[in-house]
């Protein structure tokens, strides 16, 4: 299997937290599925970017989690960070709405859709499912990624404190509701998804960007600079 699928590619802090997953039966089944898919179909993101979110934001540096669903399935869009696209790519509708809310909330205008600068500041941009077939949304759902990303969220809940979980949409809320059943020391911000179908039902006006920085400041932590240069 391609080296991009091995835990050795992850920061040591994630290796330590997730080491038990690699020996689980579901993981070997997922790897076999991915090997077949990458061999016979166009899959996003590129293999080397599957774990970009974990590489960009080590476990011990996570301050905020923004949970997405599955990667963008258009050409050149997905690069391993939820909601993000590489520099030079047109903004997908959900990201356009995210930036609209950011401007309304904090007066910040971003043109580039690459959210790497957020990830570098401790914002874990995690999709629930980490791969997808070109042009086929949710095509890799139910193959094991959900269990793996459950493990990521569970480790953060259990072994970190004062992480801010940002849940946009029912899928993110449902995922975390199952995992937040024990007492925890975290903050949760939830609202409808930023997609054009749902944004007007409460995403616009949620003020999550200023709320995140308010909570970080209250914790004595550095606030996120949401401006992308």
Curated annotation (Swiss-Prot):
Task: List the molecular function annotations (GO) for this entry.
Answer: uracil DNA N-glycosylase activity
- EC? 3.2.2.27
CDD domains xrefs: UDG-F1-like (cd10027)
Q: Does the keyword DNA damage apply?
A: yes
Database matches in SMART domains: UDG, UreE_C
Write down the chemical reaction(s) this protein catalyses: Hydrolyzes single-stranded DNA or mismatched double-stranded DNA and polynucleotides, releasing free uracil
Which residues participate directly in catalysis? 70
Keyword set for this entry?
Cytoplasm, DNA damage, DNA repair, Hydrolase
Q: Where in the cell is it found?
A: Cytoplasm
Q: What Pfam families does the database record attribute to this sequence? A: UDG (PF03167)
Q: Which domain of life does this protein belong to?
A: Bacteria
| Family statement drawn from the similarity comment of this UniProt entry | Belongs to the uracil-DNA glycosylase (UDG) superfamily. UNG family.
Q: Please give the function described in this protein's UniProt entry.
A: Excises uracil residues from the DNA which can arise as a result of misincorporation of dUMP residues by DNA polymerase or due to deamination of cytosine.
Under what name is this protein listed? Answer: Uracil-DNA glycosylase
């Amino acid at each position: 299997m391609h080296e991009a699928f091995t835990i050795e590619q992850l920061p040591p802090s994630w290796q330590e937290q997730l080491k038990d997953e690699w020996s689980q039966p579901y993981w070997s089944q997922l790897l076999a599925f991915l090997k077949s898919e990458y061999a016979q179909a166009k899959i996003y993101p590129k293999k080397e970017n599957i774990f970009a979110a974990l590489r960009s934001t080590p476990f011990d540096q996570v301050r905020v989690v923004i949970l997405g669903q599955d990667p963008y399935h258009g050409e050149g869009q997905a690069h391993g960070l939820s909601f993000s696209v590489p520099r030079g790519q047109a903004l997908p509708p959900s990201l356009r709405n995210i930036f609209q809310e950011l401007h309304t909330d904090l007066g910040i205008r971003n043109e580039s859709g690459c959210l790497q600068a957020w990830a570098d500041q401790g914002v874990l941009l995690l999709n629930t499912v980490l791969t997808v077939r070109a042009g086929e949304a949710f095509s890799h759902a139910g193959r094991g990624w959900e269990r793996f990303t459950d493990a990521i969220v569970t480790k953060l809940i259990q072994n970190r404190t004062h992480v801010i979980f940002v849940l946009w949409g029912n899928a993110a809320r449902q995922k975390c509701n199952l995992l937040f059943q024990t007492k925890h020391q975290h903050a949760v911000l939830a609202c409808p998804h930023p997609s054009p179908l749902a944004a007007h039902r409460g995403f616009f006006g949620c003020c999550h960007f200023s709320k995140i920085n308010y909570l970080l400041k209250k914790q004595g932590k550095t606030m996120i600079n949401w401006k992308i240069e």
